[in-house]
From Swiss-Prot:
PANTHER family: S-ADENOSYLMETHIONINE SYNTHETASE. The keyword Transferase applies. GO terms for biological process: one-carbon metabolic process; S-adenosylmethionine biosynthetic process. It is an enzyme of class 2 (transferase). Binds 2 divalent ions per subunit. This is S-adenosylmethionine synthase. It catalyses: L-methionine + ATP + H2O = S-adenosyl-L-methionine + phosphate + diphosphate. GO terms for molecular function: ATP binding; magnesium ion binding; methionine adenosyltransferase activity. The keyword Electron transport does not apply.
Amino acid sequence: MTTHLFTSESVSEGHPDKIADQISDAVLDAILEQDPKARVACETYVKTGMVMVGGEITTKAWVDIEEITRKTVREIGYTSSDMGFDANSCAVISAIGKQSPDINQGVDRADPLEQGAGDQGLMFGYATNETDVLMPAPITYAHRLVQRQAQVRKNGTLPWLRPDAKSQITFQYDNNNIVGIDAVVLSTQHAEDISQKDLHEAVMEEIIKPILPTEWLNEQTKYFINPTGRFVIGGPMGDCGLTGRKIIVDTYGGMARHGGGAFSGKDPSKVDRSAAYAARYVAKNIVAAGLADRCEIQVSYAIGVAEPTSIMVETFGTEKIPTSQLILLVREFFDLRPYGLIQMLDLLHPIYQKTAAYGHFGRAEFPWEATDKAEILREAAGLK
């Protein structure tokens, strides 16, 4: 019997880094709506009273960067200087250039199927059968806590909540099976006039209890609600925010490896994003097919080259068929060339702002979460 603890964290849509991610992806969506073939690499920086949007964008579209920025911040909930940030009065600075022609010549091809990767790099995808969405439980429930925080803030249940929040959950495992939740941390920005006693009680009753399954909670479970005792100053006033600084929150909460490339603000020609989505799609279909209980996929690319330079399948001893056979199935049923995976997952649509808070994986509305290849994989593996 081997027991261990594993912890993952998430942050709300009002966290400074997530504000930046959402602005970058809102700009991307606005451009893709007009020009699906645009090349976009959009970075955002937020600090007290200001937003800077920069990067390299090559497109036939015209979008209003300032209006997109203000609308995004407004939707998150920063609409008053009392919160330290106001969508209506913050400065918006734009510093956008064009994509290098040296990169263009390596990516664009007369035959779309020969489209090269927009950069070199390695990407991972992961799936596990420990939750119904085939994601690790720690990151799944960490996301759900901060999603619930936003819900009760916006619907008026707890009107004194403010947009910035963080969650963290420690799960206890026995032989890789969940046996309970050891610790829950939730820190939320709040109005000045709420007492800590009322805050603790409301967070427990309205956020934590409705989300966490009771069978995983016991008398030993520890709760840390606003452990510093006060969280009035938050958002960009408390910390500056940057696109791409929450890559573990965005993916698997540390339970799988990460190639290092961020997602937000990048169009699908950037394999940092699109190939990570494809790797999740592959891993999820392998687990959904019952070919493994856990699966991690690695793919890698060279700039300007269409075919992946490597494909790796790791199943942690849970595979039902040999790993060598799994790799052959991946190569047969999944086109992991940049253009191929864009077509396979239908990525040239404005779907990205929704990904920029509460995780890119484990959410059914995204095409890389489909399990439409599970049946054919199972048949090809001879497990029917």
